[in-house]
Structures are given as structure tokens and as C-alpha cells.
Curated annotation (Swiss-Prot):
Its cofactor is heme. Its EC number is 1.-.-.-. This is Cytochrome P450 monooxygenase anuE. Heme binds at C405. Pathway: Secondary metabolite biosynthesis. Pfam families: p450. It comes from Penicillium roqueforti (strain FM164). Disulfide bonds: none annotated. The gene is anuE.
Length: 490
């Protein structure tokens, strides 16, 4: 028997899945309408066995008429089945963001952009909600196009964030008719469902209007100056073999921007929320940093092993408020069976990240932000994801199986470097009202985040100030980063 999910359901699905898992168990079927069948996994054990160890059979995607077809015309890797087209894009992404390249080529850029983030916060502390998006976007933009994002007001950065929000909203169940399960709904007047086709068409045009001019800039630079060590240059250098259409190239580059900008920015904002709400965690991390580094020394990637508590904080942020709490469904390519449970070909499998991360048997007092729960798991998330051991897995913030985030190595480094430098350079506290009373920051998962596929922070306010003597050091380091590294990018 399958639980019936109403065709109009939309709100807080990951939370509802978690409640149902407590009632029906860690693996339960979910029927959407009269045809669509899902299986929801709220168990690290089952996720590891069905998505990691059987990834050859569980890496397809369900139909996605609205986003996959109308918005991206079948060219977006996120909505592709695990076919040859998807494998090519996956291969190209891993070639850009594999661990070796992150350690040897990309780390200087990440360090420099993180230093620029500190500078931004010194100069414009009240814009703290915008600076993380600039940081993450500039890293991805530089790697893909060789073009930086110097300020959060850069037009491409603003428009990308708006597009990602609209994608998240439009992709949520209930935002458009369930045409993937009831195809006849495609032919009903769209005004009956919020002009969903028009919204999708407009969003598609906005996507192309954002990405295509960036590709044009690279083509112009190659013609006038020459090639550069970017993702797009590498693709164009092999275009005779790859034979990609111009639209495929635009969407493929755009996918990297969409996937890397908002999730990383939201994670850093969640870090701010946690540090304000749990000041003892912030104080402990700062004490460790101060005890390890000499005066005038700012944390860097080379300090990862010396700052285990910061590594724990990164993991706990991703566990406490995962940027994608429900994950995008996988689909089975063939019938499967596991421990007496039968799964039919075409069944969608949802990894309920929120539910796993709030499993009290796995994470005691899961609602509490407690980095020390990872005291025995301070290695990088990719190590535990590749181990295939559910008990040793730290978290599922990057997904599972062959659909795990291809930018996991870059994200792990960018998040650690940013959080370590922020803890070294600043103290974040609650704002005070006109009477001098602290203003609490809302961290309630039901009210502090925008409802949608992605867990985006709603506006909040904090007081962020440089620690004693750090502002001058930050400005000197930022000038050096600009001269030595960032000036090489447009």
C-alpha cells in the first residue's frame, strides 16, 4: 500500500516525508496521482545500498516536462537519464573539479576569493547576506569562463540568483500541474494553473540571456587574445570531437553556475546563523585557530588537519540545514529487489536528506548544532561517500550514488577556507534593538527558509565585526590577493 500524495501538495515536503518515515518506516512507497510511484529513503543504510552500491541501476531521472523539457529543452544534465550525453557532461565536470586539480590549480583562486570575502565584510558588513553569493559565484565564473564577479551587484550574479530561486519554486511539487504523471494536463488552459507554461518559457529565455553572452565573451577573447585555462576553453578546444551545439554549451556552463553559486552561499549564511545562535561553538573554533596559527597568519587550506573543529563545523552546517533537504529523485533503470522489497523499473527514489540528518539514532539531539558529533569523522566528505559504509558516512549533504554533486571536492575546500577565515577574522553576534536587547535570529526550519527545492535563507540580521587587529591584516591580504591572483581574470 502506498501513501497518497495529493497532486496539489507543495509545502515542506522533506519535513512531511520525515514525519511519514516515523510512522511507516525508513523505506515507504508514495503514490502521486494515479500513475506516479516514488519510494522515499529516510535511512543511511538503505540509501547506501540502493543509491551508492547499486548506482548503475539507480542513476536515471524521472520525466521533468516543466524544467527538463520546457526550460532546458533536454540539455540540462540534472534532468537527463544516465545515458551517454549525461556521462559526457559528468566526465567534463569531473575533469574540471577533480581532487587533484582542486589541490594544485584551483586552491589559489579559492584562497584569494575568500580573502576578498573578508574584505567585502570589512567594507560593507550590513550586506553580509549578499557577499557569500559573490564569493561562490566568482569562483565558479572564474573557473568556467575566466571572468570574475567583483561585487555582489554584478548583473550576472544578481540575475543568476533570481533564476535559481525561480527554478527552485517552479520545480517544487504543486507549483505546476503534475504533467509527468497525468500527461493530459498539458492540454488544459494554463491559466488554470498560474500560467505555468508562460512562466517556464520566460525562465528559459532568461537562462539563455544570462549564459549566452558569457560564452560570447569567451569566444571574443579567444579570437583576440587566445585560449585560457578555463572549463569552456577546454570544451571549445575539443569541439571537433565533442560536436556540441551552441545551446548545449550554454546550458552545460550554466549548470555549473547554478549548481555552485546558491548552495554554497546558502551554506555560508547558515554558518552565520549557527555561530550567532551557538556562540560557544564560535568561541571554541576561534580558540583553536588562535592556538594553532601565529600572529599575522590567516588560515588556509594547508591548515585543514590542524583545525579539526572547523572541519566539524563545516560538516555540521551541512547536516543541520542541508541546502537540498529532499534531493532530486533518482529513477530505477530495471526492476530491483533488496531485503525482500521489490522495486519496479521506472520507480522514482527520493533520498530524504532532511530525514536522515534528523535521525536521532544517528545524530542524537539532531535539532541542536553540535559539531563535536563529527569528532571521529574529520576527513573530507568525499572519503566517507566513497567508502560505501553507511555507519561511517558523515552526512548526505552532497547527495549519493553517481548523482553525487560533481563539485564536492571544490565545495569542501571553498567552505572550509571561507569558514576558517571568517572565524579567524570576525565575530558574529546578535543585533541589538533600540533598547539594547539582543534580536534573536530565526533558525526554525519551518519559518527561516524559503520553501522550494533548495533551502534558501530568508533575510535575517546579525552584527558582524572584525576581531581585534584583524581588519588591517585583512585589507593588506586582500590587496595582495588582488595583485597576485585575481588580476589574472577579467
Amino acid at each position: 500500500m502506498a501513501i497518497e500524495l495529493g497532486l496539489f501538495a507543495k509545502t515542506a515536503l522533506a519535513s512531511r516525508f520525515t514525519d511519514w518515515a516515523k510512522q511507516y518506516g525508513p523505506v515507504f512507497p508514495l503514490r502521486i496521482g494515479s500513475h506516479g510511484l516514488m519510494v522515499v529513503l529516510t535511512s543511511a543504510y538503505h540509501a547506501t545500498h540502493l543509491l551508492d552500491k547499486r548506482s548503475a541501476n539507480s542513476s536515471n531521472r524521472p520525466p521533468s516536462f516543466v524544467l527538463g523539457d520546457l526550460v532546458f529543452a533536454g540539455d540540462h544534465p540534472m534532468f537527463m537519464d544516465a545515458n551517454e550525453r549525461w556521462k559526457l557532461r559528468r566526465k567534463l565536470y569531473f575533469q574540471l573539479m577533480n581532487e587533484a586539480r582542486c589541490n594544485t590549480e584551483h586552491i589559489r583562486l579559492v584562497e584569494a576569493e575568500a580573502t576578498h570575502l573578508l574584505r567585502d565584510l570589512c567594507l560593507e558588513p550590513d550586506s553580509f547576506m549578499q557577499h557569500p553569493a559573490r564569493y561562490s559565484n566568482s569562483i565558479i565564473m572564474s573557473l568556467v569562463f575566466g571572468i570574475r564577479t567583483p561585487h555582489y551587484s554584478s548583473p550576472h550574479c544578481i540575475e543568476l540568483q533570481r533564476i535559481v530561486t525561480e527554478l527552485s519554486n517552479l520545480g517544487e511539487i504543486g507549483a505546476s500541474p503534475p504533467v509527468d504523471w497525468l500527461p493530459f494536463l498539458k492540454y488544459l488552459p494554463e491559466r488554470l494553473w498560474g500560467d505555468w507554461k508562460t512562466r517556464a518559457a520566460r525562465l528559459r529565455q532568461r537562462v539563455l540571456n544570462l549564459h549566452s553572452p558569457l560564452v560570447d565573451r569567451v569566444l571574443e577573447r579567444r579570437k583576440n587574445i587566445g585560449t585560457a585555462a578555463t572549463f569552456l576553453d577546454g570544451v571549445l578546444d575539443r569541439q571537433e570531437k565533442l560536436q556540441l551545439t551552441r545551446e548545449e554549451i550554454d546550458i552545460m556552463c550554466g549548470n555549473l553556475l547554478e549548481g555552485g553559486t546558491d548552495t554554497m552561499a546558502t551554506t555560508i549564511l547558515t554558518f552565520f546563523q549557527a555561530m550567532v545562535t551557538y556562540p560557544e561553538v564560535q568561541a571554541r573554533a576561534q580558540k583553536q585557530i588562535d592556538s594553532v596559527l601565529t600572529d599575522g597568519e590567516c588560515p588556509s587550506w594547508s591548515d585543514y588537519d590542524r583545525l579539526p573543529y572547523v572541519a566539524m563545523i563545516v560538516k555540521e552546517v551541512l547536516r543541520w540545514r542541508p541546502p537540498a533537504p529532499g534531493s532530486f529523485p533518482h529513477t530505477l533503470a530495471q526492476d530491483d529487489e533488496f531485503e525482500g522489497m521489490k522495486f519496479l523499473k521506472g520507480t522514482s527514489v527520493v533520498l530524504n536528506v532532511w530525514g536522515i540528518h534528523n535521525d536521532e539514532s544517528r545524530y542524537p539531539s539532531p535539532e541542536t548544532f553540535e559539531p563535536s558529533r563529527f569528532a571521529e569523522q574529520t576527513r573530507l566528505a568525499s572519503v566517507y561517500a566513497n567508502a560505501g559504509d553507511a555507519q561511517k558516512r558523515d552526512h548526505f549533504g552532497y547527495g549519493a550514488g553517481r548523482r553525487i554533486c560533481p563539485g564536492i571536492h571544490l565545495a569542501e575546500r571553498a567552505l572550509f577556507i571561507a569558514m576558517a577565515k571568517l572565524l579567524w577574522g570576525f565575530t558574529v553576534q546578535q543585533k541589538l534593538d533600540s533598547s539594547g536587547n539582543p534580536i534573536p535570529v530565526d533558525v526554525n526550519p519551518a519559518t527561516a527558509y524559503r520553501d522550494g527545492f533548495l533551502n534558501q535563507c530568508l533575510p535575517f540580521d546579525i552584527d558582524i565585526k572584525p576581531r581585534l587587529g584583524r581588519q588591517e591584516m585583512i585589507m593588506v591580504a586582500a590587496a595582495k590577493a588582488e595583485n597576485d591572483v585575481l588580476s589574472a581574470y577579467e
